């Protein structure tokens, strides 16, 4: 079992936040979001983070200055990001392209990168220091659509953290924007290699609406969850390398061990452990919702350069008791069934549902949403310092776990999973995970959190 760094105390000094504006004048206009974008379940802020090592060829270059200038250039093309969201009739979201800019924070931390990243990574532990929540910036309406903090470490390494208003883009759309920034940091001139495309009407509801699918992920369920499961939430991350995945596969019948994807195997394991940890009524129905992109689907021709949301969260419904007591294969079949639902037609059905049912929130009770970010490209963004040592999700949410790619100190590639659970449930979750994996699992057991002292 890998260990985290010992308890550390470090200070982060931040300058006052500033607004970065597009580098040249941009159109003043209103742009409607799609009926996928403005659904209730995407009206939140999602953070991601990248860490970069010192690079000798970049000595003398300040990542803060480099990023700030390239960001302004990129915003000239992605100018809606510099605007603010407003609501129209029936709460329809649209961007008021005001060119007010995005929030940018310059910071320095008296710590070295290798003290934060070792055999595994737990970005949620220190995210509040590397991505300061500027008071008044966290809203959906009338607030900056992006918040960026660049933090220099004393070793010459640095961190790039960004918070995205999820209604504007999915992760692939964000990566497209970050790639444009990266191109400008490396000296590109003119337009981005992939010009941005708005065209949010592409995923507007059809007339008349047509909903041929049963969308379990949006069913409203009465909450009977014990109060203990609604408070004292804690965040932890877990690393799953080849040994851990093999250990999980060993719980499956032979015919499933070689035919099931890593995502299927890992997600089934996490869903089972989480269900056990929450100590739910065995008769209670629970859901697994797998975030799935419509990009690349044969029946959905997404325009190249489109950076809006193109994802759905198809779900499978099973009994909690069956998941907890049945072999792992049972939960995995539920995961596969949820994934198989995703098509272009399914996504259009979601858009129609949003308009017909008044943008219902995804199911909160008994739902577990999993978003695999290992292949979106966050780990390839090169601002001139090479690829990040980690580029991926920064924090989980109570109902949502994210997967990110990570290579440990031994050079072993694996998956970091970010988990958010009530404190008592987290302890049980770890014990359940040990049963599935034994002592292979790299997690936060016996971990003393890093302590931080923040200063403006």
UniProtKB/Swiss-Prot annotation:
Keywords, comma-separated and alphabetical: Acyltransferase, Transferase
GO MF annotations, alphabetized: acyltransferase activity
Residues forming the catalytic site: 166 (proton acceptor), 382 (proton acceptor)
Pfam annotation, one family: Transferase
TM region(s), chain numbering: none
Gene3D superfamilies cross-referenced by the UniProt entry: Chloramphenicol acetyltransferase-like domain
InterPro entries listed in its UniProt record: CAT-like_dom_sf, Plant_acyltransferase
EC number: 2.3.1.-
GO BP of this protein: alcohol metabolic process; fruit ripening, climacteric; response to ethylene
Function: Involved in the biosynthesis of volatile esters which confer kiwifruit flavor. Alcohol acyl transferase that can use a wide range of alcohols as substrate to produce esters.
Similarity remark: Belongs to the plant acyltransferase family.
Protein name: Alcohol acyltransferase 1
Organism for this UniProt entry: Actinidia chinensis var. chinensis
């Amino acid at each position: 079992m890998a260990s985290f760094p010992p308890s550390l105390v470090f200070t982060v000094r931040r300058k006052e936040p500033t607004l970065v504006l597009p580098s040249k004048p941009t159109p003043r206009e209103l742009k409607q979001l799609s009926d996928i974008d403005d659904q209730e379940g995407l009206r939140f802020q999602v953070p991601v983070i990248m860490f970069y090592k010192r690079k000798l060829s970049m000595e003398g270059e300040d990542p803060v200055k480099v990023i700030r200038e390239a960001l302004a250039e990129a915003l000239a093309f992605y100018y809606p990001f510099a605007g603010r969201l407003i609501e129209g009739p029936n709460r329809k979201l649209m961007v008021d392209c005001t060119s007010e800019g995005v929030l940018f924070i310059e910071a320095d931390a008296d710590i070295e990168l290798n003290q934060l990243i070792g055999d595994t990574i737990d970005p949620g532990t220190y995210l509040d220091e590397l991505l300061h929540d500027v008071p008044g910036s966290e809203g959906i309406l009338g607030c900056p659509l992006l918040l960026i903090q660049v933090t220099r470490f004393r070793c010459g390494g640095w961190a790039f953290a960004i918070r995205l208003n999820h209604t504007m883009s999915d992760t692939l759309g964000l990566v497209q924007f970050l790639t444009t920034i990266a191109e400008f940091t490396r000296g590109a001139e003119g337009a981005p290699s992939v010009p941005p495309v708005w065209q949010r009407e592409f995923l507007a509801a059809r007339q008349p609406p047509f909903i041929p699918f049963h969308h379990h992920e949006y069913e409203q369920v009465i909450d009977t969850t014990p109060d203990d499961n609604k408070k004292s939430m804690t965040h932890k991350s877990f690393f799953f390398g080849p040994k851990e995945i093999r250990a999980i596969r060993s719980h499956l019948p032979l015919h499933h061990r070689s035919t099931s994807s890593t995502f299927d195997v890992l997600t089934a394991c996490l869903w089972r452990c989480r269900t056990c940890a929450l100590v739910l009524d065995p008769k209670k129905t629970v859901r697994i919702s797998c975030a799935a992109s419509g990009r690349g689907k044969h029946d959905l021709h997404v325009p190249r350069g489109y950076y809006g949301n193109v994802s759905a969260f198809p779900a499978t419904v099973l009994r909690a008791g069956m998941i907890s007591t049945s072999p792992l294969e049972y939960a995995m079949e539920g995961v596969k069934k949820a994934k198989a639902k995703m098509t272009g037609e399914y996504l259009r059905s979601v858009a129609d549902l949003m308009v017909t049912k008044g943008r219902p929130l995804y199911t909160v009770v008994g739902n577990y949403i999993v978003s695999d970010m290992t292949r979106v490209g966050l780990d390839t963004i090169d601002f001139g310092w090479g690829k990040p040592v980690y580029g991926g999700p920064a924090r989980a949410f109570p109902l949502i776990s994210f997967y990110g790619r990570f290579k440990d100190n031994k050079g072993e590639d694996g998956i970091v999973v970010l988990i958010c659970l009530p404190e008592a449930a987290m302890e049980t979750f770890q014990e359940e995970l040990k049963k599935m994996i034994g002592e292979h699992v790299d997690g936060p057991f016996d971990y003393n959190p890093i302590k931080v002292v923040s200063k403006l």
